[in-house]
Amino acid sequence: MEKFQGYLEFDGARQQSFLYPLFFREYIYVLAYDHGLNRLNRNRSIFLENTDYDKKYSSLIVKRLILRMYEQNRLIIPTKDLNQNSFLGHTSLFYYQMISVLFAVIVEIPFSLRLGSSFQGKQFKKSYNLQSIHSIFPFLEDKLAHFNYVLDVLIPYPIHLEILVQILRYWVKDASSLHFFRFCLYEYCNCKNFYIKKKSILNPRFFLFLYNSHVCEYESIFFFLRKRSSHLRSPSYEVLFERIFFYGKIQDFFKVFVNNFPAILGLLKDPFIHYVRYHGRCILATKDTPLLMNKWKYFFVNLWQCYFSVWFQSQKVNINQLSKDNLEFLGYLSSLRLNPLVVRSQMLENSFLIDNVRIKLDSKIPISSIIGSLAKDKFCNVLGHPISKATWTDSSDSDILNRFVRICRNISHYYSGSSKKKNLYRIKYILRLCCVKTLARKHKSTVRAFLKRLGSVLLEEFLTGEDQVLSLIFPRSYYASKRLYRVRIWYLDILYLNDLVNHE
């Protein structure tokens, strides 16, 4: 974003946060479609696939679009003609897509400048390991072992476009930009049928920005209330009454109730609450009682319904007891496992046994969900039996082999933290046999005949890369003792989920 700072010196736009004039500057379109800023379209997006309308970008299209925006009436087209009405060889929806790309980039400018100014004079150590998805699992192993309940919340999406506009009002102070954004958003989303049929043409950067702004508003309210929440603490020998969360003034509360209870009232803030958000879900881990977990549950329901005007059912908030239930978290099934430990103690001539229980976070592979994903992509059937990949038979042998090896390594890389590797070996077996069947089908041969000819070479391709990585991490003696296959490994270089892992 540093490259934008030199362009924001015109007309006092930077000082007064006027973003609307930027929509009429050609260089902003050039920067918006720059490869460095548009890298989300090259990588696999969480929400949408790669867009292809950016290939049609040219300076002539930008100039015509700017001229058309000066005449705003020409942008208003009936919904039924949105796809048919063309302007210089492109539909009006195409121009709304270009504006959405530009709007996502423009709105990021004041936030990046504000963030950079707040960090001036401060020294921060950058830890790229914390960007990894696997970095959350060691944290949960240390924290969840001391908790007993987890609140699993499905974050709802806003059902009305005006909710998104209202959220942006707190961030963008430029009224012209907000009105223009509202106009383009409504015109862009009116064609509902076209949106459903042509999901691949949508802009992932634009909708990722809208989703993040929506979630940021929700989390700011939640964290504000969480810091100010308290519950009553009563001694066991005094009057017992329910611990109630409240958000009123503490002094007024004491004036009302201090004369009615002979017990000494105490306020206690429970610090043992951890919040983690991933994709469209969030979890709230705590050591509270089931009664307080239910109150947190209905707090989320009331927050979404009353503040965001979103109908949110209580069934979308699940209370899981980690000692009994499994928590589906980032492609893993996590639960607490009790490991009994017997310690023999001896004092002088007497010896006795001490039974201890060690609580450990157990992470398992959801084999049924992954087999369902593999079956959906035609690697196997619904029962987990490998089948040939017919759509890949037109590729070369090396290309087919490299595809299967890459998928197998990615899944093995991600699920290396599983406590039970049996399911991981089953997934590898499905992919290897699917690769053999695909190559045998291409060469019009049987699987047995093909394995006799290239069996050892094929197996070596699947094992070489993974063994080389593990041998660099662990010493040779540890690697040779086969204890490595019982150890959980968390890699700190995984920045996004694979499609087969992202089965939610």
Curated annotation (Swiss-Prot):
Pfam family of the protein (one):
Intron_maturas2
Subcellular location(s) per record: Plastid, Chloroplast
One GO biological-process annotation of the entry reads: RNA splicing
What are the annotated GO cellular component locations? chloroplast
* Annotated GO MF terms: RNA binding
Protein origin, superkingdom: Eukaryota
For this UniProt record, the keywords arranged alphabetically read as follows: Chloroplast, mRNA processing, Plastid, RNA-binding, tRNA processing
Q: What does this protein do?
A: Usually encoded in the trnK tRNA gene intron. Probably assists in splicing its own and other chloroplast group II introns.
Family named by the database record: Belongs to the intron maturase 2 family. MatK subfamily.
Q: What is this protein called?
A: Maturase K
Species: Arabidopsis lyrata (Lyre-leaved rock-cress)
- Gene symbol of the encoding locus: matK
